[in-house]
Amino acid sequence: MIKLIGVNEDNWIEIVKLSVTDKQKNFLDSPIGIIARGYVYRNQNARVLGIAENGQIIGVALVKDLDEEPACYDLQQFMIDQRFQNKGYGTEALQQLLIMLGKEGKYQCVEVCVNKTDISALRMYEKVGFQDTGYIDDNCPDCLNLMYYFD
């Protein structure tokens, strides 16, 4: 069973050792970069979460508050180590994250930007209910802006 856990002095080295395929490196920060972003965005309630399966760290996510219109949770980074991809862990972890944020209830939606060529990521986000907003960010014209709305 997938669990989301806080990053701390006991598990951060496991997270830093995570890796993705060479192609995916074009879409994601390195794990140490994700942890660093969490620190940089700490004033925006940034949270870096380890993704664990049966106690083993298999991925990492970074979510922060986005207080502009529309105010929402901003899923900045989401990665599953290449050894654990295509096993349903990403979908399950994403669902767990959405449940956690929904219970928190600060915002009505979650935003994520995904590179148009990252088909497997796009499928995963759409599978759990994210929808393309049609918005194209001038700073990231190769990305689709997807939004998940809580009921």
Residue ranges of model-derived segments:
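Residues that form or flank phosphate/diphosphate-binding pockets in enzymes
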Residues: P70, G88, S120, P141
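Conserved acetyl-CoA-binding loop-helix of GNAT-fold acetyltransferases
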Residues: I80, N86-I99, R123, K127
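Acetyl-CoA-dependent GNAT
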Residues: I2-R83, Q96, M100, E104, ...
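Alpha-helix N-capping/helix-start residues
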Residues: E9, T91, K116-I119
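Short coil/turn segments at alpha/beta junctions that flank glycine-rich nucleotide-binding fingerprints
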Residues: K87, E104-Q108
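C-terminal "cap" of GNAT-fold acetyltransferases
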Residues: Q108-I119, K127-V128, Y135-D151
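Conserved phosphate-binding and hydrolysis motifs of nucleotide-dependent enzymes
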Residues: G55, G59, G90, G129
